[in-house]
Amino acid sequence: MTQEILEDVNPTRMELLKLQDRIELAKKGHKLLKEKRDALIMEFFEMVKRASEIREQAVKKLMEAYSKLAAAKVTVGEIGVERASMATGEEIKVDVGSRNVMGVVVPIIERVSEDGGSKVVYGFADTSGALDEAMRAFTEAIDAVLELAEIEETLRLMAEEIERTKRRVNALEHIVIPRLENTEKYIEMKLDEQERENFVRLKRVKDLIERKKLKEELERVVEEGAELPSFE
């Protein structure tokens, strides 16, 4: 056979049964992986839409924050903004968790405050309302950027999983299953050959036995002096 088959295969009935089980299992696995691949692709494109919306929101919030910062600088001056910024002593802290999306572990990214809250409220008693508005706007912008980072990392991980699943589907479809099926045909061919050879061998043995019986019968007839049958 010119097709590729499994190495060191033993053409027996037992091996054929085992191979047929492997083919059935491989086909089931191929079907499940195709379903997983298709579901991942659908989920991926849904997330692409969401990522586009979140990206627009993040850009919008950043622009608003910088606009309000510019307004605050006009009100209290650049030095006043810097002093207020240093006075807060606030650091951005991020909590990174995880969740499962279609079998893919993806991150959950959240900004947290010292007391574990999910929001940090900026307030300055001796500063202008414009500066407070700028700080709140930057807080919202940071949240939007973190959300964008979360979904973009999720997209990256899902894209990798889609590629891995595609490779496994292609390997099963174009290499593993054809090789198993070619091996199945090879074993069936060998078993057919063995059956034909056994049939010929048995026929020869039968002919030999019949000839031996005929010879023994002729010898017995001769020894007994019996008359040989006439064929005239």
UniProtKB/Swiss-Prot annotation:
Q: What is its main location?
A: membrane
Tell me where in or outside the cell this protein is found. Cell membrane
Superkingdom of this protein's organism = Archaea
| Presence of keyword Methyltransferase | no
Residues crossing the lipid bilayer are none
Q: Which GO terms describe its molecular function?
A: ATP binding; proton-transporting ATP synthase activity, rotational mechanism; proton-transporting ATPase activity, rotational mechanism
Keywords (alphabetical) are: ATP synthesis, Cell membrane, Hydrogen ion transport, Ion transport, Membrane, Transport
Entry keyword annotation includes Cell membrane: yes
Give a GO biological-process term. Answer: proton motive force-driven plasma membrane ATP synthesis
What is the recorded membrane topology of this protein?
A: Peripheral membrane protein
Cited Gene3D superfamilies: 1.10.287.3240
Q: What does this protein do?
A: Component of the A-type ATP synthase that produces ATP from ADP in the presence of a proton gradient across the membrane.
By its UniProt entry, which NCBIfam families does this protein fall under? PRK00373.1-4, V_ATPase_subD
What is known about its subunit structure? Has multiple subunits with at least A(3), B(3), C, D, E, F, H, I and proteolipid K(x).
Query: What PANTHER family does the entry give?
Result: V-TYPE ATP SYNTHASE SUBUNIT D
- Protein's name according to its UniProt entry: A-type ATP synthase subunit D
**From which lineage does this chain's organism come?**
Archaea, Methanobacteriati, Methanobacteriota, Methanomada group, Methanopyri
